[in-house]
C-alpha cells in the first residue's frame, strides 16, 4: 500500500460515518427549512461541520471574513463538492448550484431546504429569472454563494469567471465577498485529488476518503461594493483577479 494513502479500514470507517451522518441528517432536514435566519444559519453551519468531521477533513480559515451586514453575494473558486460544506461551516448562506444536485439523495433535499437556487448551466434563458431571484434574496438580507467558474477545476488555478450572475449584486446594491479555496494533503502540499472536474461522485469520494489527511483552507480575500463597479464585467474582473492571486500563491508545490 502506498505510504500516502489511508488504510482500507480508515476508508471504510469514514464512509460508514458519512452514511450515518446522511441518515441522521435525512431525518432532520426540517431543521433548515423555514424558521428565522439565525436558526437556519446555525443548522447550515452544523451540516457543513458534520460532513467534514465524518470524513476527517481539517478546515483552516486563512484570512477571516470581514465585518459586514447580511445580504452579501459570495463568489468562490470551485474545486470539489466539498466546497459547499467547507464554506457553510464558516459562512452560512444559500447557494446557486447545478440542476443535477437537486436529484442527489439527501444532499439535494438539504439544498432545497437551505434555499439553494438550482440552475441549468447550459441554458441562457435561466439567467434573467435567477438574477431576479438572487437579487430578491440579497435584498431580504440573506447571503447567497456561487461559483463563477460554472464548473469545477483542479483547484491549482482558475477557469475563466462568468459575469452573468454578478448582475444580481449590482441590482441589489449588495456587497460581493471573494473567497479562495485551497486543498492540502498530509505533507502540507497543494493537491488536486479532491477535484470533481474529471470524475464522477463515487470516484471523487473514494479519492477523498483514501487520503491520509486532507485540509481545506478558506481565505476571505476581499469585499467589493457592487454599486461602485462600472458593470458586471468590471465587478467580475475584480473578484476573479483577487481570488486568482491567492489560489496561485503556492500552487507550484502541488502534488
UniProtKB/Swiss-Prot annotation:
InterPro entries: AGP_acyltrans, Plipid/glycerol_acylTrfase. SMART domains: PlsC. Pathway: Phospholipid metabolism; CDP-diacylglycerol biosynthesis; CDP-diacylglycerol from sn-glycerol 3-phosphate: step 2/3. Pfam families: Acyltransferase. One of its GO terms (cellular component) is plasma membrane. Keywords: Acyltransferase, Cell inner membrane, Cell membrane, Lipid biosynthesis, Lipid metabolism, Membrane, Phospholipid biosynthesis, Phospholipid metabolism, Transferase. Its main location: membrane. Coiled coil: none annotated. It catalyses: a 1-acyl-sn-glycero-3-phosphate + an acyl-CoA = a 1,2-diacyl-sn-glycero-3-phosphate + CoA. It comes from the Bacteria. One of its GO terms (molecular function) is 1-acylglycerol-3-phosphate O-acyltransferase activity. It is a peripheral membrane protein. Its EC number is 2.3.1.51. A motif (HXXXXD motif) lies at residues 78-83. Belongs to the 1-acyl-sn-glycerol-3-phosphate acyltransferase family. This is 1-acyl-sn-glycerol-3-phosphate acyltransferase. It comes from Neisseria meningitidis serogroup A / serotype 4A (strain DSM 15465 / Z2491).
Amino acid at each position: 500500500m502506498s505510504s500516502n494513502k489511508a488504510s482500507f479500514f480508515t476508508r471504510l470507517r469514514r464512509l460508514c460515518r458519512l452514511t450515518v451522518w446522511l441518515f441522521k441528517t435525512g431525518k432532520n432536514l426540517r431543521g433548515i427549512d423555514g424558521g428565522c435566519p439565525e436558526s437556519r444559519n446555525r443548522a447550515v453551519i452544523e451540516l457543513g461541520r458534520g460532513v467534514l468531521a465524518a470524513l476527517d477533513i481539517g478546515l483552516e480559515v486563512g484570512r477571516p471574513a470581514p465585518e459586514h451586514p447580511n445580504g452579501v453575494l459570495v463568489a468562490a473558486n470551485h474545486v470539489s463538492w466539498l466546497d459547499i460544506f467547507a464554506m457553510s461551516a464558516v459562512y452560512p448562506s444559500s447557494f446557486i448550484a447545478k440542476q443535477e444536485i437537486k436529484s442527489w439523495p439527501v444532499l439535494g433535499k438539504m439544498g432545497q431546504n437551505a434555499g439553494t437556487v438550482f440552475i441549468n448551466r447550459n441554458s441562457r434563458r435561466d439567467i434573467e429569472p435567477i438574477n431576479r431571484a438572487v437579487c430578491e434574496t440579497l435584498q431580504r438580507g440573506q447571503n447567497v454563494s456561487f461559483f463563477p467558474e460554472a464548473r469545477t477545476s483542479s483547484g491549482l488555478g482558475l477557469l475563466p469567471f462568468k459575469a452573468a450572475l454578478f448582475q444580481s449584486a449590482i441590482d441589489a446594491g449588495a456587497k460581493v465577498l471573494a473567497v479562495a479555496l485551497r486543498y492540502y494533503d498530509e505533507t502540507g502540499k497543494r493537491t488536486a485529488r479532491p477535484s470533481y472536474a474529471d470524475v464522477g461522485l463515487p470516484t471523487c469520494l473514494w479519492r477523498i476518503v483514501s487520503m491520509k489527511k486532507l485540509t481545506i483552507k478558506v481565505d476571505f480575500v476581499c469585499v467589493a461594493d457592487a454599486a461602485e463597479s462600472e458593470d458586471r464585467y468590471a465587478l467580475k474582473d475584480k473578484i476573479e483577479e483577487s481570488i486568482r492571486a491567492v489560489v496561485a500563491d503556492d500552487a507550484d508545490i502541488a502534488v
